[in-house]
Amino acid sequence: MKILGCFKIVPDLDFIAQEDWMADGQLQVDTSYAKLLWNCFDEGALEMMLRLSDLSEGFDVVYELNALTVGRLRHETFLKTLYALGFSHAVRVEAEEDVDLRFCPGLIADVTAKYVKETASSDVIVMGTQSSDGSNMKTPLLLAERLGWTCITQVTAMEPVDEKHLKVTSQEDGKTAVQVVTVPIVLAVGNAPCAYLRVPTLKDKMKLGKRPIEHISLHEELAESQSRNVELKGLTPI
C-alpha cells in the first residue's frame, strides 16, 4: 500500500519580535529570519504513518511511505530527515520566494492531485487538517474532491488491516469514531496523541539522508490558478 504524506514547513512565530509584527505594502509580515518548524498537525500525521509501518509486520502488509511538500530550497532538509526515517521517496514542489501560498488551498490541492494522478499513484494521502499560518482547513477536503476520494477529518490513529483497508480512529462531534475504511482515501490528521516526529539516528542520516529529492515546477499550475482568480477592481460605498 502506497501512502503519501503531505506536509508544510512553517516559521516559528515565537521568534518574531513584537516590533516586527508590521505588515509591508503587500500586507505580509517578514518571517524569513525565524526558525523553521514542521507544521504541528503535519508532524503528527508523518509520525502516524511511521507508527502504521511499525505495526505492519504482524499483518503481512507492506507500506511504502512517500512525502510531498510545496516549499523552498531551504525546506529540503526536512525531506532528508524523512529519508533518514525510512521514507521511500521525497518530492518538493518548487515555490518561488515571492509567491505567497498561505491562502491558496485550491492551488495546493490541484498540484497534489495532479502529482497523484499523473506521476505517482497513491492509495492513501495523509496530511494535517490545517496549518499554523494559513489555517484554512480546506486543503484535505479540496484534494479529496479533485481526486473523487473519500475524506475523513480529525483523524487520531491508523491501524493496519490488509492491502485494501485501514482501521481509522477519528473525532466526530466530540465523540470517537472507529471504522475500517477502503482505500483510496484522504486522511486529515487533527490533535493526534503522536504529536511529535521521531528523531533519526546519525547513522541513518549519513546512510539514507543523501538520497536525491524529486523536484516539480509550480509555474503551470500557478498560471492556471491565477487565470481563474477574481480580480478586485474597486469598492463603492452603499
Predicted region positions:
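Short Gly/Thr/Asp-enriched flexible loops that form oxyanion-binding sites at enzyme active sites
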Residues: 134-149
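Short internal beta-strands
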Residues: 64-72, 92
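Gly/Ser/Thr-rich loops at beta-strand to alpha-helix junctions
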Residues: 71-74, 130-135
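Electrostatically charged, flexible surface regions
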Residues: 155-238
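N-terminal beta-strand-loop-alpha-helix module at the start
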Residues: 1-66
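Glycine-rich phosphate-binding loop signature in dinucleotide/nucleotide-binding domains
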Residues: 112-122
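A glycine-rich helix N-cap at a beta->alpha junction
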Residues: 77-111
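Glycine/charged-rich beta-loop-alpha catalytic/anionic-binding loops adjacent to active sites
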Residues: 24-35, 88-96, 121-127
